[in-house]
Structures are given as structure tokens and as C-alpha cells.
């Protein structure tokens, strides 16, 4: 049997991240595609994971997450945003942010509902909506700075709208919402039975002195939102797969109904380790904006004379590369050329759209060692010099 006739996702293939990472391995290319660091975690975190296993924390953890970790999460939210969150009723530890997003969508969205999301949208969003029997309403962000078109959002709202799926800082657009955006969103859904799912895994990767605009800081939205975060991003440890969701007690109960049958719980020793790490280093995340901004600036400065345009990167650990000076639109083909001719794997943006526009942009991951970034930029600059600008 070549195909399964009753597939719930008949048009969904392997994610672009898996495809490009596999191709990078096959070709021995530098992988600036998938968003994970090529440097190690803090050795202390590794020591704490090993210690937790040796101490016997190797059986099921509590379904909602280890209380000591949930208490540290509440403390972190207080330090980050001045918020008071009840670790018992408002914090749920999840198998990464993706599971939190999936479980929240399954908990509150059903057949016939509509979910508004903003393209380019992260590729796990739409399948989660469709698996709930609902429909995604995809509203493109406005390039080149990928701003929200709030008039289109207002026009898309109807009695079937159940959820707005928000993402800030935005992957893959590298944009960041403002407090004004949050106030506008609150105004758009005011008085309606509409919830918000806010993906904020890059909360600490914002640049140029900006503060992260979390929905938790907008009181109307906070009451109607699931807000999702990631220790994988905050601790440079994507393989640990530890995320968490913050919501009101009412919404948290609904989330946990799905979470308990989705994963039940996540790695017990890892939760102990992260709780202990946060106890030892409660503000370890404070240096992240400067750490990643230095990498962003390193890449932008090195590519300044390459001929590539560099759209603003206000958040996330990515940088977009506009190749319109070198080639007609076609980001998948250009990403393939960068991979095979320059030896650098990137991610095209068109897979993140329902209806891709003519795109001349690929995404680079800058969460890499400086030596990796320097070599990648050297290869990209050499590639640009070889192919020359279109019409030159």
C-alpha cells in the first residue's frame, strides 16, 4: 500500500527542517537551517541532569509537572514580568513548546471552528488545528518588516472564530510584536468568545534595547490566553524538550485534560535538573539578548557588502537573507543552490505559507559558534561573488 486512503493530513509531508538538516548531513554542509545551537549547554545543567538520575528520579513525574519546577517558573515570571502566577493552578510543564501548543488547541478548538494565524506561520500550527477538525484562517504579515494587518484581522473575525494563534518574537519572520499590537488584539476580540494561543519561546531573544511584549502583560489578553515558553530556547538545550504553558486556572484545567492523555508527563530527572539549575542561577537568562545580538550583528556586518539585503531582525535567533539582487523569486530553489554550491543549509520561507507569495528570502539560524557563523558567511560571500547580481 503506497498511500493511506484515510489520512487526516494527506497533503503533509516531512517538515522542511528535517529535509534541510538531512541534506546538510548528506552533503557535509554547515547547517544554518534548523534552529538549534552547535555549542554545548552549560556543563552545570548536564551535571544536574546526571545527578538527578543517580538520585533515582527515573519514574513518572507528576502529570502537571514537578512542583519545585513550577515554583521556579512562577519565580521566573515574577522576575521577568512582575507577575504573580499560581504554580499549582496556572503552570503546566510540557514536552517542549510544541506539545503545549498542540494540547491547548485540542483542548479548546473543535469541528467547525476557525483559528486565525499569521503567515509565515510555524509549521506545527496548521496541522494541530486541522487535527482538531477546525479551519485555519491564514493572514499574511506585511513585509518587509512583517507587521500585522489589523484591518484584515477584524475582517476575518466571525461567529466561528475560536482562537487567535499569536507568535512573538516571530519565527520565521524575525519580527516582534509591540505593546500597541497587544492592545489592538485585545480590542479586536473584546466581548467575543475568542481565546489566544501565544507562542513566546523566544521571549528572551529581543534586540536593540526592546522589551518583550508578552500577552501576560496585557490584562485582558492574559485572562483569555495560553502563553507558551521553552527552556530549550532559554537554556540552549533543545534536546531536553521542556516547555511550559501559563494560563488561567480555568484554561489550565482544560489544557491538562488533553496533556494527561497526550504525554502524561515528561522527563522526571530533567525537571529536577532544571529546577535545581534555576535555584542556583535564577537569572541566567538575562544575558541572552546581548549574547544573540552580538551574533546577529556579526552576521549582518559580515554580509553588509555581499549584495544580499538584510531585513530587520528584531527578535528570535534567526536572520533573513533577501536574495532579490541575485535571482528571480523562488526561495526553495535558491536555498538548494546555497546548500549545493555554497555548502550552507538555510530554510526557505514559502513552506510557512498557505499561499506562498513570490519570495526572495531564506532564513539563517545564528545560534551557532562564532567560528561556524564566520565560515558560513565566508561561503555565502564567495557564492555571491561567483554568481553576481542579476542584470549586473
Outline where the language-model segments fall.
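Conserved glycine-rich beta-strand-loop-beta hairpin in the small C-terminal domain of fold type I
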Residues: 275, 290-300, 310-323
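Active-site phosphate-binding strand-loop segment of PLP-dependent enzymes
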Residues: 137, 141-210
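A short helix-loop-beta submotif of the ANL/AMP-binding
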Residues: 131-137
Amino acid at each position: 500500500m503506497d498511500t493511506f486512503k484515510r489520512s487526516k493530513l494527506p497533503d503533509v509531508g516531512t517538515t522542511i527542517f528535517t529535509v534541510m538538516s538531512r541534506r546538510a548531513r548528506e552533503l557535509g554542509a554547515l547547517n544554518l537551517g534548523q534552529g538549534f545551537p552547535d555549542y554545548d549547554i552549560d556543563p552545570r545543567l548536564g551535571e544536574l541532569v546526571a545527578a538527578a538520575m543517580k538520585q533515582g528520579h527515573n519514574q513518572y513525574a507528576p502529570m502537571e509537572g514537578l512542583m519545585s519546577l513550577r515554583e521556579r517558573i512562577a519565580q521566573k515570571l515574577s522576575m521577568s514580568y512582575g507577575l504573580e502566577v499560581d504554580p499549582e493552578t496556572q503552570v503546566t510543564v510540557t514536552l517542549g513548546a510544541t506539545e503545549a501548543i498542540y494540547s491547548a488547541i485540542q483542548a479548546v478548538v473543535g469541528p467547525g471552528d476557525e483559528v486565525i494565524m499569521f503567515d509565515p506561520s510555524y509549521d506545527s500550527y496548521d496541522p494541530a488545528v486541522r487535527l482538531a477538525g477546525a479551519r485555519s484562517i491564514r493572514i499574511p504579515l506585511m513585509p518587509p518588516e512583517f507587521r500585522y494587518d489589523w484591518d484584515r484581522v477584524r475582517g476575518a473575525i466571525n461567529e466561528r472564530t475560536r482562537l487567535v494563534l499569536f507568535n512573538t518574537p516571530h519565527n520565521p519572520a524575525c519580527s516582534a510584536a509591540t505593546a500597541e499590537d497587544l492592545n489592538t488584539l485585545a480590542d479586536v476580540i473584546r466581548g467575543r468568545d475568542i481565546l489566544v494561543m501565544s507562542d513566546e519561546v523566544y521571549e528572551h531573544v529581543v534586540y536593540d534595547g526592546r522589551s518583550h511584549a508578552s500577552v501576560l502583560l496585557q490584562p485582558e489578553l492574559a485572562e483569555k490566553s495560553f502563553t507558551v515558553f521553552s527552556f530549550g530556547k532559554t537554556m540552549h538545550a533543545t534536546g531536553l524538550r521542556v516547555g511550559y504553558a501559563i494560563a488561567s486556572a480555568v484554561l489550565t484545567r482544560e489544557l491538562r485534560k488533553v496533556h494527561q492523555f497526550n504525554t502524561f508527563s515528561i522527563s522526571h530527572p530533567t525537571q529536577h535538573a532544571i529546577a535545581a539549575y534555576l535555584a542556583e542561577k535564577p537569572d541566567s537568562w538575562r544575558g541572552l539578548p546581548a549574547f544573540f545580538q552580538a551574533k546577529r550583528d556579526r552576521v549582518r556586518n559580515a554580509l553588509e557588502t555581499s549584495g544580499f539585503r538584510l531585513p530587520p531582525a528584531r527578535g528570535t535567533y534567526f536572520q533573513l537573507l533577501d536574495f532579490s539582487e541575485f535571482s528571480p523569486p523562488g526561495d526553495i530553489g535558491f536555498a538548494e543552490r546555497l546548500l549545493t554550491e555554497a555548502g550552507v543549509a538555510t530554510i526557505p520561507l514559502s513552506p510557512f505559507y498557505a499561499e506562498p507569495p513570490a519570495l526572495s528570502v531564506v532564513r539563517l539560524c545564528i545560534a551557532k559558534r562564532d567560528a561556524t557563523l564566520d565560515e558560513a558567511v565566508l561561503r555565502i560571500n564567495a557564492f555571491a561573488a561567483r554568481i553576481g547580481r542579476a542584470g549586473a
